[in-house]
Amino acid sequence: MILDTIVEATKIRVAQEKQVEMPEAVKAAALALPSDTGFPFEAALRQQDFNFICEVKKASPSKGIIAEHFPYLDIAKEYEVAGAAAISVLTEPDFFKGDKKYLQEIASTVKIPVLRKDFIIDEYQIYQAKVWGASAI
């Protein structure tokens, strides 16, 4: 089953990432950031009667590559202008072709909350999300 395959790949990837960026350092960096980033995710979703979260996604296991040319910052800016309450950014690299840089750059560009979308299996990834600029996971 594809989900099992993705979870197993995620376990391997997270173990490798922990060798590059030590968990204690990532946790310390996350905890050193302000607890209120100015992008309260829940508040953004409660601002109107109808809200939407738009997704920035380059590929999926079922569809393959969705966008060969992937102007992720332009896409995110267009979502914000269109009235999105938040933006979901794929960071899973193997099956969705996501990248932490997409999250980092989008989070530093838009004024609405940004969600890290990945297969979260370890608290390490939660601290990564905070360091990378995510408002939610």
Please tell me what each predicted stretch does.
Residues 3-67:
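An N-cap/entry alpha-helix motif that binds or orients negatively charged groups
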Residues 52-56, 87-89, 114-117, 137:
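Hydrophobic faces of well-ordered beta-strands that scaffold small-molecule active sites
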Residues 55-59, 66-70, 93-97, 116-126:
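Glycine-rich beta-to-alpha transition loops that act as phosphate-gripper elements at the mouths
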Residues 66-90, 109, 123-136:
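Alpha/beta enzyme core
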Residues 36-43, 47-48, 53, 96-121:
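Alpha-helix-loop-beta-strand connector modules within alpha/beta enzyme cores
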Residues 24-32, 60-66, 85-106:
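Glycine-rich, proline-tolerant flexible connector loops at the mouths of alpha/beta enzymes
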